[in-house]
UniProtKB/Swiss-Prot annotation:
GO cellular component: cytoplasm
GO terms of biological process kind: fatty acid biosynthetic process; phospholipid biosynthetic process
Matches recorded under HAMAP family: PlsX
Family: Belongs to the PlsX family.
Top-rank taxon: Bacteria
Native species: Streptococcus gordonii (strain Challis / ATCC 35105 / BCRC 15272 / CH1 / DL1 / V288)
Name of the protein described by the UniProt record: Phosphate acyltransferase
Location of this chain's protein in the cell: Cytoplasm
């Protein structure tokens, strides 16, 4: 039975969204146990499940505007810190939070800990593509600066994730760059290209451009954290803008527009589903000794349940264990 520690007090709609998502997950899966950390009285208002779930009460929580490292050190009884400590102590197998991203990264680094020989854990998320499969990208902002070796490690981690969690055999790995030619890019990109091309265990397809990402050009895309975070926000904004403009045009376009929308109802619903990647779960701080997953601060119960499903898959496929085994080989090389 796998145990998942949940910071029930993090996020815009805590604890309701976290607890209702937990209820859904417990109905869907019979092989997980959930530990909810937070205000017991508030959690019980929404908790309908009675089996395979427990509550660890705490009055303390980390707020969205708290300074991350300071919050982890000073709020030692907060729901997020206690959830991370449970993993470190072996009382839980993974952590889920919708709270302060920086604080969760700090909790992952300083409490859960890095896998040996991983230089810098990266933030990985599955982002949407027009055909619906999506692609995994990292780093999405865990690190402001990266070296070529960091990006090389991200390619290996991303490949493990795509293959183990998403079931993609020999995932195609692309390096985000300003052109597809091998000679393109700054020194970081050029050095990374050489490292990736030299590793035959990776299905490296070369450089990929940002304009091709949502067309499914690669299954795994690696980049530095600064660039990755900018791309993430650009994709989020583009998806929201497209759906918002469609809705505005339909509502303000008169009878013909409304009739057209009615005829295209199923197609529009499919488009919305493809652009909405919440079903893929949350962002994984990959490279740690256990899954630490951040779901969006505005997540609803459905998204929380999807993130629990994602964590369950990570645990059952032992993607972290595979990473530990792979990176332990570096000591013998």
């Amino acid at each position: 039975m796998k145990k998942i520690a949940i910071d029930a007090m993090g996020g815009d709609f805590a604890p309701q969204a976290l607890v209702e998502g937990a209820n859904q997950a417990l109905q869907e899966f019979s092989d997980i146990e959930l530990i909810l950390y937070g205000d017991e009285a508030k959690i019980k208002q929404y908790l309908t499940a009675s089996e395979r779930v427990s509550i660890v009460h705490t009055d303390e929580k980390i707020n969205s505007d708290d300074e991350p490292t300071k919050a982890i050190r000073q709020k030692k009884n907060s729901s997020m810190v206690l959830a991370a400590k449970a993993v470190k102590a072996g009382e839980a197998d993974a952590v889920l939070s919708a709270g302060n991203t920086g604080a969760l990264l700090a909790a992952g680094f300083f409490i859960v800990g890095r896998i040996k020989n991983i230089d810098r854990p990266g933030l990985l998320s599955t982002l949407p593509t027009v055909e619906g499969q999506g692609f995994d990208m990292l780093d999405l902002g865990a690190n402001a600066e990266n070296t070529a070796h960091h990006l090389y490690q991200y390619a290996k981690l991303g490949s493990f994730y795509a293959e183990s969690v998403r079931g993609i055999k020999r995932p195609r790995v692309g390096l985000l760059n300003n052109g597809t030619e091998s000679s393109k890019g700054d020194p970081l990109r050029k050095e990374t290209y050489e490292l990736l091309a030299a590793d035959s265990s990776l299905n490296f397809i070369g450089n990929v451009e940002a304009r091709e990402l949502m067309n499914g050009v690669a299954d795994v895309v690696v980049t530095d954290g600064f660039t990755g975070n900018a791309v993430l926000k650009s994709i989020e904004g583009t998806a929201l803008s497209i759906m918002g403009q469609l809705k505005k045009s339909i509502l303000g376009g008169g009878l013909k527009a409304k009739l057209g929308a009615l005829l295209l109802k199923d197609s529009l619903k499919e488009l919305k589903s493809r652009l909405d990647y919440s079903d893929a779960g949350g962002a994984v701080l990959f490279g740690l000794k256990a899954p630490v997953v951040k779901t969006h601060g505005s997540s609803d119960a459905k998204t929380v349940c999807s993130t629990i499903r994602q964590i369950r898959t990570m645990l059952h496929t032992d993607v972290v264990g595979k990473s530990v085994t792979e990176f332990s080989k570096e000591e013998t090389q």
